[in-house]
Amino acid sequence: MTDIAATLNHAGVPCWEYGLTAVDAYCGHVMKSPIGFYLVEGSIVDLARNFENLEYPSLPYADASLGTEAGDLEARFLCVENLSERSLGSLALTDFRRNPLDGRFHDPRDLYPLLKDRIFDPGSEGGENALFETALYLSRLQSAPAMSIKVPPPPTSAAPLWQKDLLSLILQGERSAAAFDFLKDSGFIKKYWTDLDALLLVDHAKDCHPEGGGWSHTMEALGYRKSRDLTVSLAILLHDIGKPHSASSEGRRFDRHAEIGARLAARFLRSLGFSSRITDDVAFMIRWHMLPAALPRIPISRVSDVVLDSRFIDLLEVFRCDEFSTFKGPDVYYASCAAYKAFMRNNRNPYRDQEGRKKAEIYSRL
């Protein structure tokens, strides 16, 4: 039971997890940066009595919300008169719920057979928040065989928190690419996330990127993640958004795209309300995502401030996904890791400089 559920239970306010939170619990999916959906039998007044820093976003799934100021878990609260109410969202799967006190699931729409096989089949369902809900479930579950998903048009307006939740939750799913392709087909990406949409205009050379253009490459890279860490996933998603705005120079087709992309990514994340820490970390990884490939060939001491940064380990994961998505094999990545490990070993050795030379030999030449 989460601290939020425990707080409400102690106050005598009944609550259940529902929708994606209940589905994740059933499937054993754990998010590193969780956003919990809670069904509350009470009012926002009851919530305000128990939580400081409560906000009221007036979203289809959130009468009230808590950010990370309250702890590691963000929460979105939907207030109802009775916990047994149905039609909580636009899709039947959103009615799936779990009692956090005893861990029991409640399935008023008889969806267990599909969930058991990790299948998502919305049929012809639709509604105000259908695009949001469909994208989230597509990031977790497999589409039913031969199913044609109804693609709703993008909303006429999309609040920053709604977009931030959508992006954060999709990226913490195993099937992120399926959800992003769905959003692309709906026109949402083109309307709201234009920097991502511009990747469709990036045409890669087939010998370097047999997986396809900018969009296909990015979706392929997401599939190589070892974890669903939100910050690393954001960096992978946005690592090439500078390419549509870069120019060829001295044999480099997308010259300075990393620097451009870092600025665009920071602007995008700030506009959605991501924390300064996440924004800065993502911008750092995008700015330097080309560096690991050069480590075996350059004096690493020249870029020691970057390599010694605590975020460089995460940067190597971004590089691995970027490199593996091109089907080149692991050789370049392993060579970069070997160079990095050698540098770090020498950096800790008091008898050698950062390039591995014995310091006594260096001093003898002076």
Report the location of each language-model feature.
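Catalytic cores of the polymerase beta-like nucleotidyltransferase superfamily
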Residues: 1-366
